[in-house]
């Protein structure tokens, strides 16, 4: 899908209007205390820009956690209102619902660029369209979903979607607001980077894929093999490739039985498309999956003995991967090279990160998919040293898999 044809917040006039913004304020809470406010900070450029345009009001809506279509006090967005007020340096009015006559009245009467935060969208089953009751999936009533969407629509004159993290969900607040729909700055930044990589990358284009299971990445690998020039396969899933392709002894390392059936066809596609594939040639091993495990080493040639497992790639692999990274122009990285949470098995991932930072400094583009790889960048304080660290794990993965994201499709075209 082309992402460059959608309207952005800067393409529309917000003066005197109620600007309804779908943000991602799904922040971690410890009681009433927000333990990481990064997602609130991420939405500030869009909120501040909207306020500068002299709107009637800025109305913010978000989900938090998984309250499963019911009102659950610990998932209230009320603590977020206080934090946002502090960050904006102006009052934020918190409403204790997100739809209904009282909310509609408060938004209608708002004036002078007032900032309003609505209560958690997911307190209503109509937001996600279903909920789990006693382990069974219960669907929301279609007419109730329609009424919920109608009430949300009535709150604004223009709808801004800045919640990339939920763009892969066809939820009411993402696709059901019947207003002109534009992207906010965070959403636009995500889409710009991914469209640059997927539609018009500087080459050589490298994808680095790590993580545990091949089966989880089949669609991703298949789509990227039509786009990239180079592919590094690392992390736990490398063992499945090495065992299938070279008959390598992998000891107690991860082996993905389901994913293994696709290895040969993927390699055949890589060969057909002239994609160079790089696999680890040596490993840091452990006698158990534990941060205090005994540490050993092994090569792909010798194999890993029984009773041992590979938890990281070794120094030769790291050196080769660094060379591939620093000679590529566009890099998409999804999945770590080893169990970086354990210090003894973090070197491969850290080496990869260092190479990515170095190639960025040389003017190349490095995009980090959300999830674990974003955690790696954060752990080592390198988020700002990379071109782009995605805020959406699931959403970025689905984009890279070639899927259309409902929240993006729903944006108005230029």
From Swiss-Prot:
Biological processes per GO annotation: canonical glycolysis; gluconeogenesis; glycolytic process
Cystine residue pairs: none
Taxonomic lineage: Eukaryota, Fungi, Dikarya, Ascomycota, Taphrinomycotina
Residues that coordinate or bind CDP: 211, 216, 235, 335, 337, 340
Cofactor(s) needed: Mg(2+)
Residues the record lists as Phosphotyrosine modifications: 75
Primary location group: cytoplasm
This protein's record includes keyword Ribonucleoprotein: no
Residues the entry annotates as binding (2R)-3-phosphoglycerate: 23-26, 39, 62-63, 65-66, 121-122, 168-169
Biological role: Catalyzes one of the two ATP producing reactions in the glycolytic pathway via the reversible conversion of 1,3-diphosphoglycerate to 3-phosphoglycerate. Both L- and D- forms of purine and pyrimidine nucleotides can be used as substrates, but the activity is much lower on pyrimidines. Negatively regulates the biosynthesis of acetyl-CoA from pyruvate in the mitochondrion.
Name of the gene encoding the protein in the UniProt record: pgk1
Family the UniProt entry places it in: Belongs to the phosphoglycerate kinase family.
Compartment annotation: Cytoplasm; Mitochondrion
Protein's name according to its UniProt entry: Phosphoglycerate kinase
Bilayer-crossing regions: none
Keywords recorded for this protein, A-Z: ATP-binding, Cytoplasm, Glycolysis, Kinase, Magnesium, Metal-binding, Mitochondrion, Nucleotide-binding, Phosphoprotein, Transferase
GO molecular function, one term: ATP binding
Pathway: Carbohydrate degradation; glycolysis; pyruvate from D-glyceraldehyde 3-phosphate: step 2/5
SUPFAM superfamilies from the UniProt entry: Phosphoglycerate kinase
Binding site for ADP: 211, 235, 340
Modified positions (Phosphoserine) in chain numbering: 76, 143, 172-173, 183, 253, 260, 328, 351, 387, 390, 412-413
């Amino acid at each position: 899908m082309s992402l460059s044809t959608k309207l952005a917040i800067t393409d529309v006039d917000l003066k005197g209007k109620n600007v309804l913004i779908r943000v991602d304020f799904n922040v971690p809470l410890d009681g009433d205390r927000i333990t990481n406010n990064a997602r609130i900070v991420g939405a500030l450029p869009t909120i501040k820009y909207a306020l500068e345009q002299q709107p009637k009001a800025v109305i913010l809506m978000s989900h938090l956690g998984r309250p499963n279509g019911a009102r659950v006090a610990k998932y209230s967005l009320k603590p977020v209102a206080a934090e946002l007020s502090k960050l904006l340096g102006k009052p934020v009015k918190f409403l204790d619902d997100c739809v209904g006559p009282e909310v509609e009245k408060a938004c209608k009467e708002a004036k002078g660029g007032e900032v309003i935060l609505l209560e958690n969208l997911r307190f209503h089953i109509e937001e996600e369209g279903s909920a789990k009751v006693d382990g069974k999936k219960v669907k929301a009533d279609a007419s109730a979903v329609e009424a919920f969407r109608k009430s949300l629509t009535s709150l604004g004159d223009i709808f801004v979607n800045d919640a990339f993290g939920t763009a892969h969900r066809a939820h009411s607040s993402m696709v059901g607001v019947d207003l002109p729909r534009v992207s906010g700055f965070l959403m636009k930044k995500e889409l710009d980077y991914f469209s640059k990589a997927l539609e018009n990358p500087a080459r050589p284009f490298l994808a680095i894929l790590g993580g545990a299971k091949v089966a989880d990445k089949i669609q991703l690998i298949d789509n990227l093999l039509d786009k990239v020039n180079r592919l590094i396969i690392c992390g736990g899933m490398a063992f499945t490739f090495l065992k299938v392709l070279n008959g390598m002894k992998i000891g107690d390392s991860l082996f993905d039985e389901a994913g293994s059936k696709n290895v040969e066809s993927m390699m055949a596609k890589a060969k057909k498309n002239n994609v160079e594939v790089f696999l680890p040639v040596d490993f840091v091993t452990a006698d158990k999956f534990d941060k205090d495990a005994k540490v050993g080493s092994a090569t792909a040639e010798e194999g890993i003995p029984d009773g041992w497992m590979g938890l990281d790639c070794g120094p030769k692999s790291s050196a080769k991967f660094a060379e591939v990274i620093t000679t590529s122009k566009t890099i998409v990285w999804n999945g770590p090279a080893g169990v970086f949470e354990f210090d003894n098995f973090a070197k491969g991932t850290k080496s990869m990160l260092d190479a990515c930072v170095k190639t960025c400094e040389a003017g190349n583009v490095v995009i980090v998919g959300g999830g674990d790889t974003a955690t790696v960048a954060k752990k080592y304080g390198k988020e700002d040293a990379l071109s782009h660290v995605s805020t959406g794990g699931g959403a970025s993965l689905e984009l890279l898999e070639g899927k259309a994201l409902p929240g993006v499709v729903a944006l108005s075209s230029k």
